[in-house]
């Protein structure tokens, strides 16, 4: 199965984190990082795939988006108590700043509102 993110142009190409070391390196940045915890089998995770590349492009220079497969990086998912997917967790300087987790399917406006809030919180810390 082809992955939608790999089919889009170079403007939006969310990095998939494959190692704990890379995850720690990315979240240590001084700019906000939004980590999206997903799995390959989660329908709600795939629901967001069509609009995430555009969202990533719209927020370029303000926030970095990364994707984490919660099953492949189980240690990271457990460290941050990721129980539901998709889960959005924002970081700055290696510390969690805010998260967006609930049992419901996430919509584009909700995700945009979360990212705006993550940027604002990041600016305040």
Question: What residue ranges belong to the model's regions?
Answer:
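Structural micro-motif
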Residues: 80-92
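Short active-site neighborhood of thiol/selenol oxidoreductases, capturing the structured segment around
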Residues: 28-40
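Short hydrophobic/charged patches on amphipathic alpha-helices used for structural packing
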Residues: 23-24, 74-77
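Thiol-based oxidoreductase modules, predominantly thioredoxin-like and allied folds used
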Residues: 16-18, 37, 52-56, 60-75
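Non-catalytic, surface beta->alpha helical segment in thiol-disulfide oxidoreductase systems
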Residues: 90-125
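N-terminal "domain-start" segment that seeds a small globular fold
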Residues: 2-25
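Conserved redox-active cysteine motifs that mediate thiol-disulfide chemistry
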Residues: 37-50
